[in-house]
Amino acid sequence: MLTKAETANDIAAVMAEVGRKARAAAAPLSIATTEQKNRALIAAADAMLEARGDILEANKLDLANAEKNGMAASFVDRLALDDGRISAIADGIRAIAALPDPVGEVIAEWDRPNGLHIERVRTPLGVIGVIYESRPNVTADAGALCLKAGNAVILRGGSDSAHSSAAIHKALVRGLEAAGLPADAIQIVPVTDRAAVGEMLKGLDGAIDVIVPRGGKSLVARVQSEARVPVFAHLEGICHLYIDKSADLDMARKIAVDAKMRRTGICGAAETLLVDRAAAAMHLVPILEDLAAKSCEIRGSADVLALYPAAKPATEEDWSTEYLDAIISVALVDGISGAIEHINRYSSHHTEAVVAEDAAAVARFFNEIDSAILLHNASTQFADGGEFGMGAEIGIATGKMHARGPVGVEQLTSFKYRVRGDGQIRG
């Protein structure tokens, strides 16, 4: 692996070669059979378990560096691997193997009056670049998902997890080799310098078809700003939970606690709670007391503080803040119209949920809010590819082009048209 001391020209040359290898591997991978791809995935899962000791030793090196660098406990937790987490990674790869193969699926077909038969068929995207921070499991998830969808992938993880990711990558390559697929179909960037990211964002001379960033706001913002190829991403998850006056209170209380507190550091965690002003006297205080009992800090608007003085005053900045912590901003709104207005003003278009029994209110919520994921009577924390039955996800996209919401194997494909005739001409 190169070091940060390498020159920009060296890095550009190395990355160009990575791109060439990925593009060369993409061609045979695109026509690999379902059986081949599944055999590679299952062999990779087996190799992951066989290499458990090596992976844990590599992870110890990364953890020691993290401790030396004074990294936060939450960072260390994301970085750490143990027997259980390695088993979960292997299980996740097997789950991806069990998914239907999207490649070659006929999405639609029809006949024309002139006798032409037209089919729209799923095809791989080609080469995917995945840029992520120090989560070793993303190495396995991204590699496996791209393989299942017939794509070559270039993985660039954070330098803090370099040893762990390299050990996991070896297991993925063993899987490819066991199935007779090109080892270069899953590559890990051999450069620690951040200049490698810049080269990927340029597209590696046309080698990369799409970039998927997985990480914090600064990483995603850089990718979205600098990328010269399409990007599947979300900048942040400012997710809202609206409690309508028609909501069942017991249900609302359970959903509010889960949406905020189940895991506060994920992009699907609720950051703002909106309560129908018409139900505030009955609904607001019990819900906030439940959240406070779980050590959640409440930041409320002036009318919320009037009913729940224990809250801290919310500022304008709070309504557009992704806390990723045990903090929630709370406001009263004038029914479904007020909720829609607030959400459309402050949302990052990731995930929003409504708790209501009024079908008309739910219909307006679904129709008038333009976010990637909308839920009714369910926690925002279901915003997850696994929970959607996708097996896993490479990320969540909030853009409107191609992929939106959880990005699983189907979203990692494009399509082409097959047109069958029997001698038709347009003359």
Swiss-Prot record:
Keywords associated with the record: Amino-acid biosynthesis, Cytoplasm, NADP, Oxidoreductase, Proline biosynthesis
Keyword Cell division: no
InterPro entries named among the record's database cross-references: Ald_DH/histidinol_DH (IPR016161), Ald_DH_C (IPR016163), Ald_DH_N (IPR016162), Aldehyde_DH_dom (IPR015590), Glu-5-SA_DH (IPR012134), GPR_dom (IPR000965)
GO CC terms, sorted: cytoplasm
Compartment list: Cytoplasm
Catalytic reaction list: L-glutamate 5-semialdehyde + phosphate + NADP(+) = L-glutamyl 5-phosphate + NADPH + H(+)
EC number, as in UniProt: 1.2.1.41
GO molecular function, one term: glutamate-5-semialdehyde dehydrogenase activity
Superkingdom to which the source organism belongs: Bacteria
Entries under Pfam families matching the protein: Aldedh (PF00171)
Recorded metabolic or biological pathway in which this protein acts: Amino-acid biosynthesis; L-proline biosynthesis; L-glutamate 5-semialdehyde from L-glutamate: step 2/2
Primary location group: cytoplasm
CDD domains tied to this protein: ALDH_F18-19_ProA-GPR
Record GO biological process: L-proline biosynthetic process
Function as written in the Swiss-Prot or TrEMBL entry: Catalyzes the NADPH-dependent reduction of L-glutamate 5-phosphate into L-glutamate 5-semialdehyde and phosphate. The product spontaneously undergoes cyclization to form 1-pyrroline-5-carboxylate.
Database matches in PANTHER family: DELTA-1-PYRROLINE-5-CARBOXYLATE SYNTHASE, GLUTAMATE SEMIALDEHYDE DEHYDROGENASE
Family affiliation: Belongs to the gamma-glutamyl phosphate reductase family.
Name the record gives this protein: Gamma-glutamyl phosphate reductase
Origin organism lineage: Bacteria, Pseudomonadati, Pseudomonadota, Alphaproteobacteria, Hyphomicrobiales
